[in-house]
């Protein structure tokens, strides 16, 4: 029976009680040996013989990338062991979560002195913009991923964020300079002009000697 707007009436579903035994057996066999069943079994058997991907946390931990973005660290200079941070405030300005706050003042020697450097980890989204924009590689991301605790002693202030002097090594994580950074440096136009002038001087030197 055809209705308006190309709608059709579906045939009424036969009640299971009214079906014959043979019809129910046929329906059961079709459902049991359909392609959907074998595709599901294929996926289950493939996962059964594949290497396990689950870990027993917290007894085990997944390996992290060297450039993983976790809890921040404040770096020191390798030579003088002084803080790398110069208080420029670029990390505070670029922070999209507005979780970094820097308070600076003028020291006795006339240089800028950092009075307070705080990061609200409750608002931080670990985007890494602060580490990218830092001109002195003063703030980087470490590998401490577990930052939830019920004890106040677990949390700290700026002295706890600073890298300890006994473990001063060149940082290679997120925000650091790449290994081949020197090879990827592009020369400036001024260096090209200097090279051209040196080449011209080297070419003119033999001509002057021959004239003499």
Swiss-Prot record:
The keyword Hydrolase does not apply. Its EC number is 7.1.1.-. One of its GO terms (molecular function) is quinone binding. [4Fe-4S] cluster 1 binds at residues 85, 88, 91, 134. [4Fe-4S] cluster 2 binds at residues 95, 124, 127, 130. It is found in: Cell inner membrane. It is a peripheral membrane protein. NDH-1 is composed of 14 different subunits. Subunits NuoA, H, J, K, L, M, N constitute the membrane sector of the complex. This is NADH-quinone oxidoreductase subunit I.
């Amino acid at each position: 029976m055809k209705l308006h707007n190309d709608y059709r009436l579906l045939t009424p579903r036969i009640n299971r009680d009214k079906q014959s035994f043979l019809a129910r057996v046929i329906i059961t066999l079709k459902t049991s040996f359909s392609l959907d069943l074998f595709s599901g079994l294929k996926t289950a058997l493939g996962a059964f013989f594949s290497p396990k991907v689950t870990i027993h946390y917290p007894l085990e931990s997944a390996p992290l990338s060297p450039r993983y973005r976790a809890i921040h660290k404040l770096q020191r200079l390798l030579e003088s062991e002084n803080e790398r941070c110069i208080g420029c405030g670029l990390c505070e300005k670029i922070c999209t979560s507005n979780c970094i706050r820097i308070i600076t003042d003028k020291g006795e020697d006339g240089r800028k002195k950092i009075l307070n450097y705080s990061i609200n980890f409750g608002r931080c989204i670990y985007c890494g913009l602060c580490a990218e924009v830092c001109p002195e590689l003063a703030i980087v991301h470490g590998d401490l991923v577990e930052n939830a605790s019920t004890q106040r002693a677990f949390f700290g202030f700026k002295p706890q964020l600073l890298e300890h002097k006994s473990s001063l090594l060149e940082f290679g994580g997120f925000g650091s300079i790449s290994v081949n950074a020197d090879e990827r440096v592009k020369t400036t136009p001024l260096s090209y002009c200097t090279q051209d002038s040196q080449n011209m001087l080297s070419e003119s030197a033999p001509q002057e000697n021959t004239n003499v």
